[in-house]
Amino acid sequence: MHAGWTFIEALFADLYPGQTPKHAAAAIAPQHDLRLGRASVEGTHVYDAGNAWHYVTLGLTDLYDQSDASVGPNGIRCELSMRVAKRDSAEPPLWPVAFLGKIAAHVSQGSVLAQAVSFRTGPIAGAPADAGLEGAVALLEPAIAPRPGPFGKVGVILLVGLTGLQLDEIKQGGSAKLIAEIAADPARQLT
C-alpha cells in the first residue's frame, strides 16, 4: 500500500477501529489525462458509522508521491467526505460516490472548497427524491483535524447535503446562522 493511501485509511481507522471499508471506484485515467469525464479520484471508501454511511474520497491528496500539481508543503490537501443516513439500507447507496466524484472533478480543475462554502448543483442524481437535495455546504470534518501527512498537511472536508430552501436561505444572507447550526450539531451533518 502507498503512503498517502495508508495515511487516509489511518485517519478513518481512528474513527472506525477494526473496520475494513467497502470500496467503490470508477475506471480511472492517468492524472495528466484532462479529458472531460475522467475520474478525479481513485475511489471512495465507505465506513459503517452506525446510523449513517461515511464516505471518503481517495485521490485529491497525493497518494503515491508529492506531485508537481499539488499545493506546496505549507498548504492543506483535502479529501472529501459525506455522511449519509442509512434509511434502513443494508448496503451503502452509490449516489454519494458519484456526487463526491463530481465535486472532486471540480476541485481538481481549480474550484476551491473551504469551511462554510455552499454551492447549488441542482437535484442530486440518485439521492432520495423526498430529501430534496440540491447542493451542499463544505465544513472541515469535525472528527478529523488537519495533520501532517507523508506529502504535506492533510485534511478532510465534510460535504453536507442541502435542500433548495436551505440554499435559498443562504443566498438571502442567512448563511452564517444556518451553517453555524449545522456545524454545531452532528445530527444535522447527516445527508
Where do the language-model regions lie?
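Short linear motifs embedded in intrinsically disordered, proline/glycine-rich low-complexity segments
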Residues: 1-191
